[in-house]
Regions:
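Long, low-complexity, Lys/Arg-enriched
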Residues: 1-50, 57-113
Length: 113
């Protein structure tokens, strides 16, 4: 049976990213959320949770996903010189997926001296 993958990102998943996951049906969610709880039903309906999100949202996704893998893409940032001499273009080249295991956030007030 084909696995289902949730892709939470503003950008489309690249072919390289898709291919590296194997036979997975990707369902993209491209919207602003304040809490991963807003996507609880979608998280429950998918087998793999792939996200591009701030650390606090990553922690929430990890909590809600239970034993399901929550993964993030690792990319190389490559500056590509432009033929016309304009500013170099930034490209992201996919390297691998990393599975989030645990996220602890510890904060304190910062008061400049």
């Amino acid at each position: 049976m084909k696995q289902k993958g949730l892709w939470f990102s503003r950008h489309a998943m690249t072919e390289e990213q898709k291919n590296s996951l194997g036979d997975v049906e990707i369902n993209q969610i491209n919207k602003t959320i304040h809490s991963a709880k807003e996507l609880k039903a979608e998280i429950e309906a998918n087998d793999i949770i792939a996200i591009v999100a701030p650390i606090e949202l990553q922690r929430e996704f990890l909590e809600l996903a239970g034993d399901k893998p929550v993964i993030t893409a690792v990319n190389d940032r490559v500056l590509v010189p432009q033929q016309d001499g304009t500013e170099d273009k930034l490209e992201f080249h996919f390297r691998k997926w990393e599975r989030l295991i645990k996220i602890e956030i510890e904060k304190e007030d910062y008061i400049p001296s």
